[in-house]
Amino acid sequence: MTNIRKTHPLMKIVNNTFIDLPTPSNISSWWNFGSLLGICLILQILTGLFLAMHYTSDTMTAFSSVTHICRDVNYGWIIRYMHANGASMFFICLFMHIGRGLYYGSYTFLETWNIGVILLLATMATAFMGYVLPWGQMSFWGATVITNLLSAIPYIGTNLVEWIWGGFSVDKATLTRFFAFHFILPFIITALAMVHLLFLHETGSNNPTGIPSDTDKIPFHPYYTIKDILGAMLLILVLMLLVLFTPDLLGDPDNYIPANPLNTPPHIKPEWYFLFAYAILRSIPNKLGGVLALVLSILILVLVPFLHTSKQRSMMFRPISQCMFWILVADLLTLTWIGGQPVEHPYIIIGQLASIMYFLIILVMMPAASTIENNLLKW
């Protein structure tokens, strides 16, 4: 009798995705982040669901409802902080996952890569709207500043902003719709993640060497299920250390002050995972130019597969490209630091130089390094 795992229509899908999936035998821990992102997503949906049971999306009661969750709801504080810090863990895993894709040339799977970029944009939108919901000072002013950027779009900008606000300023209508979108988007992300996996399993996984591994495949279970469980345990360990010891480490103290449209905080800044993009936005003195740079800083990922000039897929055997990659990582860390600093000398010039470097490395230096390596190998 054939195993039900291989015959049942639903079980067959699960089997071909998580059990009998042929997997390269040499993939490293950098390939763990896909499953960790899945765990983060499930965790965020579950904690978010329980928070939504007690949250009210009204400007008069939103701040109080979050306080009520932390003070009066059974284990409300842990659910709230798991959700807030879970977002940080989500983005850490996302950045690692994208970095892995860039380093090992996984972006040559075009469909998988492009769905991944859409997933990144959807996750960023979800996180931004979630940050608005507690209705603290940084929530209100963050929403005001970021939505206002759309007014830089010629001709339709102002109308577009007022349409998104649902009025002439960030108010009750804005908060209500942000809550609605924040609730629905994770389910859209889940559907997109399934499409992401579908496209990945059409080609099979890449591996650190970038060389096709069809001759050397092993079943996903038990080899990589056990490896993923170890990764998940480490993820939950780090998350719970954050939640239980320093829950507000990555937050902004200004968000414990209720939103006040008459009082602007001294330094408006987003959550840490948006600071690199915020620094690029601020580095251009022109409003429309800044908005374009901000959008391009993310959409540049779509161009990466077309900028691949190397005869090799992975950077494993390409030392010059490796140097470029790690300079890019250092540059992104610099941008993240600058994004959290006030707009004054010397931070302005550092931010501008780091922004120029970011685009220069991806568009010019990396393809050039690949061409040099090809010539050195006489290819």
Swiss-Prot record:
Any one of the GO BP annotations: mitochondrial electron transport, ubiquinol to cytochrome c
Record bears the keyword Iron: yes
UniProt KW keywords: Electron transport, Heme, Iron, Membrane, Metal-binding, Mitochondrion, Mitochondrion inner membrane, Respiratory chain, Transmembrane, Transmembrane helix, Transport, Ubiquinone
Entry's transmembrane regions: 33-53, 77-98, 113-133, 178-198, 226-246, 288-308, 320-340, 347-367
Annotated binding of heme b b562, by residue: H83, H182
Residues reported to bind heme b b566: H97, H196
Residues given in the record as a ubiquinone binding sites: H201
GO CC annotation: mitochondrial inner membrane; respiratory chain complex III
Protease keyword on record: no
Topology of the protein relative to the lipid bilayer: Multi-pass membrane protein
Pfam families the record matches: Cytochrom_B_C, Cytochrome_B
Cellular compartment(s): Mitochondrion inner membrane
Principal location class: mitochondrion
Cofactor stoichiometry and binding remark: Binds 2 heme b groups non-covalently.
One GO MF term attached to the UniProt entry: ubiquinol-cytochrome-c reductase activity
Cofactors, names only: heme b
Coiled coil (UniProt feature): none
Subunit and partners: The cytochrome bc1 complex contains 11 subunits: 3 respiratory subunits (MT-CYB, CYC1 and UQCRFS1), 2 core proteins (UQCRC1 and UQCRC2) and 6 low-molecular weight proteins (UQCRH/QCR6, UQCRB/QCR7, UQCRQ/QCR8, UQCR10/QCR9, UQCR11/QCR10 and a cleavage product of UQCRFS1). This cytochrome bc1 complex then forms a dimer.
Protein role: Component of the ubiquinol-cytochrome c reductase complex (complex III or cytochrome b-c1 complex) that is part of the mitochondrial respiratory chain. The b-c1 complex mediates electron transfer from ubiquinol to cytochrome c. Contributes to the generation of a proton gradient across the mitochondrial membrane that is then used for ATP synthesis.
Family membership: Belongs to the cytochrome b family.
UniProt miscellaneous comment: Heme 1 (or BL or b562) is low-potential and absorbs at about 562 nm, and heme 2 (or BH or b566) is high-potential and absorbs at about 566 nm.
Protein name: Cytochrome b
Lineage: Eukaryota, Metazoa, Chordata, Craniata, Vertebrata
Name of the encoding gene: MT-CYB
